[in-house]
Amino acid sequence: MLEVNNVTFSYSTHGEQDAPPALHEVNLSIPPGETVAIIGHNGSGKSTLAKLLAAILKPTSGLVQVDGLRTDASGEDLWTIRQRVGIVFQNPDDQLVASTVIDDIAFGPENLGLPRFEIEERIQEAMALLDLEAYAEMAIKDLSIGQKQQVAIAGVLAMRPRYLLLDEPTTMISNHTARRLLDTVYRLSQERGISVIHITHFMHEVTGFKRVIVMHEGHVLMDDTPTSIFARAGELQAVGLDVPMVTKLGRRLHQQGWSRLPEVILSIDQLKANPCSSN
């Protein structure tokens, strides 16, 4: 369980202790196996929250816990947290550390001190999950940005985390590659019980998640299912967000008399499953 209890966080710059809080008295919990999308405009606090959950940052006040372990701890507890919580950043170059694909994926398991046979097993498994077998010996510098992001995710998955944090990992890659990556991690959540926390500003990416958290000015503004969140289009627009295009289309058709359609449509498949017929 990831738990955030009354957490406030401020970035101190140049020694100033009175910086405006990036997060203010945030409370939430994420149980094992849950898929959660966190959305919000730039500066809403969503990436700060991710870094707190991964113990990269420590709260200014309040408490963040991973399976009961405090993220402001040190030593063995902190080491355990960083094994259990994997994070993938927006720019893969920020976390790729080796010169070849296979060496980068091996980096995490090797630092866990695992036997060689288990390291090899994890490498092969992670490469298969992300379709990277053909690129094993390729130099990182020769990869596209999308391929680099696949390697970054594979490296995190090779650590076999319980919680996978995706901090806007699709911003720099194509829609096709983004869809494949999200399908892979969503499938892993279903098959292995990994919690996936996906931070994004692309509304169409969150429709398949069980839960959506909306951040605004360091606060949790909404926390509900995608259907319930996107039913509140006016409130989202008031904080600089919007609903997916397919949701807009479904609502427009519903308003024009296509009564078989649900009021909130989340996918093209839903449109296909509800043939339009007007009153």
Give the location of each predicted region.
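The feature captures the beta-strand-to-loop junction immediately N-terminal to the Walker
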Residues: 39-41
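Helix-to-loop junction immediately C-terminal to a conserved catalytic motif
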Residues: 54
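ABC ATPase NBD Q-loop/coupling interface
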Residues: 63-80
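Conserved ABC ATPase "signature" region
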Residues: 117-135
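Conserved ABC ATPase signature
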Residues: 139-143, 147
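Catalytic Walker B motif of ABC-type/P-loop ATPase nucleotide-binding domains
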Residues: 164-167
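Conserved ABC ATPase "signature" C-loop
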Residues: 218-219
